[in-house]
Swiss-Prot record:
InterPro entries: FIP_sf, Fungal_ImmunoLectin_sf, Immunomodulatory_FIP-Fve_fun. One of its GO terms (molecular function) is carbohydrate binding. The keyword Acetylation applies. Belongs to the fungal immunomodulatory protein (FIP) family. This is Immunomodulatory protein Ling Zhi-8.
Length: 111
């Protein structure tokens, strides 16, 4: 199915859908570490969780932070990585996990 066909299929099924999962990566201290990623406008129809993987190593699934009043949501890597940020030389993958099916979908990747 083409991207266009998928979009119009969603428009038919859902009617109104507004989201923005463009990742905003937050650097730590020192600044060669990534501490967070924030998604500007997330889906709120379910209590989605996130799974984080670093260079192919699964760091697990954690409960998500509350959605902010502007619709954004933050994923804090310190909670996945024993209180440490993730070196920006690594590949960081963030997956959103559907609470109904436990299926996960990649939503952001660093490197």
């Amino acid at each position: 199915m083409s991207d266009t066909a998928l979009i119009f299929r969603l428009a038919w099924d859902v009617k109104k859908l507004s989201f923005d999962y463009t990742p905003n990566w937050g650097r730590g201290n020192p600044n060669n570490f990534i501490d967070t990623v924030t998604f500007p406008k997330v889906l709120t129809d379910k209590a989605y969780t996130y799974r984080v993987a670093v260079s192919g190593r699964n760091l697990g699934v954690k409960p998500s932070y509350a959605v902010e009043s502007d619709g954004s949501q933050k994923v804090n890597f310190l909670e996945y990585n024993s209180g440490y940020g993730i070196a920006d030389t690594n590949t960081i993958q963030v997956f959103v996990v559907d609470p109904d099916t436990n299926n996960d979908f990649i939503i952001a990747q660093w490197n």
